[in-house]
Amino acid sequence: MSTLFRVAWYRFRATFSHRWSGYLTIVLLVGLVGGVAMGAIAGARRTQSSFPIYAASTNPSQVDAFIAFVDPAIHDYAGYYPAKARAMAHLPHVKEAETAIGFDANLVLLSHLHTHAEPGQKPPVFEGSTNDDFTKEDRVTLVQGRLANPARRDEVVMNAQAAHQLGLHIGSRVRLGFNSDAQLLSPDCCSAKATPPKVVVDLRLVGIIVVASTVVQDDVDHLGSQVALFTPALTRELAQCCATYSSSALQVDGGAGEIPHVQSEIDAVIGKALATAGNGSGATAGQVQVAVATAERAIRPEAIALAVFGGIAALAAILIAAQVIGRQLRLGADDASVLRALGAGPAVTAADGLLGILGAVVLGSLVAFAVAVALSPLAPIGPVRPVYPYPGVAFDWTVLGFGVLALVAILGALSVGLAYRAAPHREAGRRRGAAARASAVVRAMATAGLPVSAVAGVRLALEPGSGRSAVPVRSAILGAVLALTVVTGTFTFGSSLDTLVSHPSLYGWNWNSMLLSGFSGDEDLPQHEATTLLEHDPYVSGISGIYFGSLKIDGQRVPVLGGSPGAPVQPPLLSGHGFDAANQVVLGATTLADLHAHVGDTVTVSNGATKPTRLTVAGTATMPAIGTQGPHLEMGSGALLDYDLIPATARNLQESTVPGPNAFLIRLRPGANPTSARRSLSRIESRLNASSDGAGGVVGVLRPAEIANYRSIGTLPGLLGGALAVGAVIALGLTLVASVRRRRRDLALLKTLGFTQRQLAATVAWQSTVAVAVGIVVGVPLGIVVGRTLWNLFARDIHAVPLPSVPILSIVLIAVAALVLANVVAAIPGRIAARTPTALILRAE
């Protein structure tokens, strides 16, 4: 073994001067494409974990207790009870407590502002705490300006949504009035006869903040995500006179196992207080805790897409590197034959040049490590990126360590295998058993009378030849196929992703518009009047009235969409059939899995008011993001069933005298002008919601979080795709150059037979073009199949309608660009071959 190494080391030093360029090529290709692969996979992991890491940095609470609300119907006449807040803060296992006090119903906007409310969007929530400025527990994140001074009553911070809705910016001033609780409960409240507000405050917006629970959300939650925070100084002044509601956020000591005990203790405290202090709605999981699960699910598609891209890049790195390594070994075949003639054994001839290649693989893997680290500041992608607490360079040692080891091990093994296969004793055996085979394509072209340069070029591209002049033409063609497969597959997957984002029907919004009642659909639309107006609208082809609610299905609480059996407008199906009868239910795919049920099974639905009902699972559908604030339908979760299963009181929470659906799903006639239709529907909405004080509206689309967040992923996918394309182009170019150089002897013979310089250049161009053409014929369809297959797997994973998109124009441009590249690459070696004296090439023969 020591002798073998000494010989290999000697040969490495002796041949390095004319083999270094090949080694450098291996280093650069492995480093670039392998680094992109590791960077993408590490970025996917960093993206998927980004929100839990951010949430942990805000010091989140685990339990929320909504303890007071001004409402005579529940005998609650004040929005804040300090005694209840103190009692919960001193419960066993509670280590920290923060009480947020809201002033929404008591608040009067006295400034004349240019507001920008979207249809169905709620006004901003105005809250404050008496003992915290939201910098300790459930910390807010400052993104612009500064935090308010806790000791000043005239400063306020808002999130960007609230500032945009109110038309404010840093430095803007707004005047607010606050009615006392007694004024709020007065019959004359908020009318022209009402007394002036008890407290008037001029506030200046000093900062834009982000609240953790609103970082990742769908468009339904976005309708109610506007938040403004008062200082403790102002909150203490308003708490005793003008509070609408209050809730306590609690941190639990002792781990997650103590949370249920604390929740039961909170319910007991609230129950004891009923006789003297009002009513409470119990304890729930903290907002940030709930948001973590939602955010991880919403971010997952971007992380999966990034990981899929990384997997494609990793495969490309291995295959491209294998091609380059094989060519490098073949370049030393003549030297290996000389060594064999001098008495070297199979081990020595196989090891010739292998030491340099293995060194290049190791060095390239280290370069890939550096490239992946250099790409790390581009992650995480998505909505968490602006508030991620630990941006910049990151070392994901799991990906980096395993990635480097995998590259070294896989490429090292391939190098040894290729070196053994290319050893002279094996090569000689193959030559003895191989016979020169003529290509049918070449014969056909010759028979057709095509120019001799064309026939010669096609022969050089397709026929390997025999004996010492044999050339591995399959490697050149395989390199072209590989490059075009990778690029086409990447473009197909990316096009399908763009199609999903731009086609709402693929993510559940299987209609054109929704007529919404109240804020986020929390009121009713008069059934008869709304149906009559919509059915007589010239632009409308179909409508379905729907109700929002939640029911227990097989004991699990599930958000539901109540409709009528056989309604013309329903979410798009994934399996089975639609909701056609009152004894049927259509479920989201995630909900179906959570219930451990299948299409055709029977489930039990209960509402707590009537006898449980057994329903047959008719099918699964891509559920839209739809409903009111809180738990609502999402892409994979929810149920569509008969609206009569939702209790009548739950369908009419505002106790409307003319009850009806919370919303209407509207499908327009084919060819209807969208602008004219929107104006017509807006007139209907104004008539139906005339008394809603601006609430409700016509909504074009509500996107799920998975889709809404896609637009915030930044430039990383484009950069990675560009790097992969560059790697594929470089590999293709090197393949073509090496293929032409291997044919120098054949070109010299053609020149001896009378070929002119122009004919030689044409021959080389034909050789290169044919190799790429075969790559196009095989690689493009294969890339489309790979891209479509990956997309179908991805779409089913996120429960979207699996409809892959093939970018025909882009693929045509890829094919044209590949042909242009083939001729550009062939021009230089073709010109060199034409000008090289024949004697220099044939002298070795």
Give, region by region, the residue ranges found by the protein language model.
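Interfacial "coupling" helices/loops that link adjacent transmembrane helices in transporter permeases
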Residues: 15, 19, 319-358, 396, ...
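Glycine-centered tight turns that cap/initiate beta-strands
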Residues: 93-96, 539-542, 838
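Feature of multi-pass inner-membrane transport and sensor proteins
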Residues: 1-28, 46-52, 56-60, 330-353, ...
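Juxtamembrane segments of multi-pass membrane proteins
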Residues: 59-77, 444-447, 451-581, 586-590, ...
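Membrane transport/envelope proteins' first extracytoplasmic loop
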Residues: 1-318, 322, 327-331, 346-347, ...
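C-terminal transmembrane helical bundles of large multi-pass transporters
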Residues: 662-664, 691-820, 825-828, 837, ...
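Hydrophobic positions within alpha-helical transmembrane segments of bacterial inner-membrane proteins
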Residues: 34, 311-314, 318, 323, ...
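Generic beta-strand/beta-sheet core signal
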Residues: 100, 177, 206, 339, ...
